[in-house]
């Protein structure tokens, strides 16, 4: 099956991208006259993830900005440590948007508010996962 994407803007572009993501039979996309090979992977029963092997997408900068976290490595935050993380020394917290934060060496501070520095941010299908280091326990 082939899907042809004209030169849409705004809401029409969003609609065409949604239709493309739903159509798991699409193997090639014609976007602005360029053929793109595409594969679809079913991440879960309800999530269809489009994996595009073409690195030069015209919309890539806009998508990157939309998917970028509000916090960057080096940012300082105050978080309440809610529970222990996967590793024995980690503490776990959440941001206002629901993003998960793992804090190194914060397990002793469960139930307390601590100051942390963002180490790195990962984007997953479920949202952002942030890793931070404990700055102080004050």
Swiss-Prot record:
The keyword Chloroplast applies. Keywords: Chloroplast, Plastid. It is found in: Plastid, Chloroplast. GO terms for cellular component: chloroplast. Belongs to the ycf81 family. This is Uncharacterized protein ycf81. The lineage of its organism: Eukaryota, Viridiplantae, Chlorophyta, Nephroselmidophyceae, Nephroselmidales.
